[in-house]
Amino acid sequence: MNGRACRILQEGAAELGVEISDELVTLFSLFADELKKWNRKINLTAITGDEEIALKHFVDSLALCRLVSGDDELLDLGSGGGFPVLPLALVFPTMTAVSVDAVEKKIIFQRHAARLLGCRRFEAIHARGEDLPRMLERRFNRIVSRAFSDIPSFARMALPLLMPQGTIIAMKGRGGAEEADAARGALEEMGLTVVRVTEYRLPFSGDARTLVEIGFC
């Protein structure tokens, strides 16, 4: 990444309460370079500029740091090029992080990136979300996604994999709070409820973002 992108990463993360050391900047820069290189061959992301990657992939993913920790067992459903799961795995190296996507080439990239970045507690699985309950015996206390278009569909897929005291976290944009309100009825039918809605602005761009936390009733 260029110098401005590195500054966006560090300063943007700091606005969200996350300290990014110079060592981590080097790792994130390596991640960005690999993402761009692989993206020339396979379609991983439409976001290709250094500054955009730093802000819309890295900083955006790190907004979850306020809701997760290094002790978590985290599952990212529909992770695409590795977001938000790989940035979280870099910041929390002790976190058990599992990434799932239905597109095999994206999972192959994630495995390569994780090896390159030294993410030892990271696993990437090529699967459809609905197939996971019969593939995985384990359960997770944090299940996250920024890929799903609607909250009930995400919650329905995550529910069989959620620990009793765990939370499902949907990363949404503008209108996320209203979407959470509209989903309450469907969630209650699943035995779930909206625990908390956090609205904030993405640093530098000012774009509206919403984190919707969902737990058992």
From Swiss-Prot:
Keyword terms: Cytoplasm, Methyltransferase, rRNA processing, S-adenosyl-L-methionine, Transferase
The reaction(s) this protein catalyses: guanosine(527) in 16S rRNA + S-adenosyl-L-methionine = N(7)-methylguanosine(527) in 16S rRNA + S-adenosyl-L-homocysteine
InterPro entries per the UniProt record, alphabetical: rRNA_ssu_MeTfrase_G, SAM-dependent_MTases_sf
Source organism superkingdom: Bacteria
A Pfam family recorded for this sequence: GidB
A GO molecular-function descriptor: rRNA (guanine-N7-)-methyltransferase activity
Keyword Transferase part of the UniProt annotation: yes
Protein's cellular compartments: Cytoplasm
Binding site for S-adenosyl-L-methionine: 78, 83, 129-130, 146
Assigned protein family: Belongs to the methyltransferase superfamily. RNA methyltransferase RsmG family.
Annotated protein name in UniProt: Ribosomal RNA small subunit methyltransferase G
Main location: cytoplasm
Broad EC category: transferase
Gene Ontology CC terms: cytosol
EC number: 2.1.1.170
Role, per record: Specifically methylates the N7 position of guanine in position 527 of 16S rRNA.
SUPFAM superfamilies named among the record's database cross-references: S-adenosyl-L-methionine-dependent methyltransferases
